[in-house]
């Protein structure tokens, strides 16, 4: 239990003894009443002095505003169904705006609604299982929406896995349309459950269902969304470190979202030393393969290039089974690196030890003929040996390859979906096998979280 308290403290989730819901509601309603009294003492119009029609309209406006204000103050999803008794206690008909709730009041209120409780969610199907965690498809009793429940087993000797700590600590602060939303966090003595928004598929499954033959327009839309989410992370000094098609989730609308931040890191300076045992082998850059532990955001950009190629061709770019084979595949396509293409490479002991043949670079167009000239240029800019020379996610968003998407895609708010623009729609994939990713009606965004 002490370990769990320490874990919560690290995530800024622990507080002194929280106020009871009655105490927090009293505080909330007192703020309403004080403001109401102050308004009358200041000589402003009271409801009795207004005509019935004006009184009714005023009450309706105040009630609507109060409900919206409550959602904002508690950071609730827009489709939340608050218990009726909870709404009655808040006395939403009172006019005026209270000052913001304290952190303790907010958390007590959230707990009263049902957040942070296992009984709020119903497990439906088991989606997968790993060393530390099992993922279930579930349903929220609060919203009736589907959710993904990532149940992490807590070993009493070790406490919460560091990957879980990283994932929660990073995701609770990331609010972007192309990053999976963490809705809730539930802890017990035996497990830590992360409640995520549910998405129907991932990029690997999408490729499988379209026969590994994607419409090139869809490739562009998915690529832009990947870069949007990644640029948002990189601006906040966060490296994902495990980009691969399986970690790019896709819903029926076609929205692509970065997921699985278990290996992600918040970096303070570009040269900070990290483990080189990160990133699935096929998407691992050559500098990391050769043992480099000093890297920054370019570690993710090599993987982006590999994913672009895979979407365009339907097959992985460098499917090596060992580090040596992976390097061999890279060098055979891009040419064995030299001091000109990769300054300092000859001083890397691992590179000298492998003693690779001297391959000449091959034209990428011959391997990815469906990519146009701009697409090949973007791919080339991502697959550079010298990490600092790779194009950044922010710069890639402005690459001419995306010009056909229009200018408005660059003006969206972080939480706005690219599909909120009527000109952005997926097209039918040539190899379509029956998995529908149709564009549904545009409703309000549900990307809201309690964090």
Swiss-Prot record:
Positions where Phosphoserine occurs in the chain: 51, 66, 109, 417, 420
Biased composition (Polar residues): 52-61
Source superkingdom: Eukaryota
Listed transmembrane segments: none
UniProt GO cellular component terms: cytoplasm; nucleus
Binding, ATP: 127-135, 150
Any one Gene Ontology molecular-function term assigned to this protein's record: cyclin-dependent protein serine/threonine kinase activity
Enzyme's top EC category: transferase
Family annotation (PROSITE patterns): PROTEIN_KINASE_ATP (PS00107), PROTEIN_KINASE_DOM (PS50011), PROTEIN_KINASE_ST (PS00108)
Keywords: ATP-binding, Kinase, Nucleotide-binding, Phosphoprotein, Serine/threonine-protein kinase, Transferase
UniProt cross-references to SMART domains, sorted A to Z: S_TKc
UniProt-listed Pfam families: Pkinase (PF00069)
Domain Protein kinase: 121-402
Start and end residues of each stretch annotated as Disordered: 39-61
Catalytic residues (positions): 242
Biological process, per Gene Ontology: positive regulation of myelination; regulation of cell cycle phase transition
Tissue: In brain, kidney, intestine and at a much lower level, in fetal tissues.
E.C. no: 2.7.11.22
Family the entry assigns: Belongs to the protein kinase superfamily. CMGC Ser/Thr protein kinase family. CDC2/CDKX subfamily.
Role according to the record: May play a role in signal transduction cascades in terminally differentiated cells.
Protein name (database record): Cyclin-dependent kinase 18
Organism lineage string: Eukaryota, Metazoa, Chordata, Craniata, Vertebrata
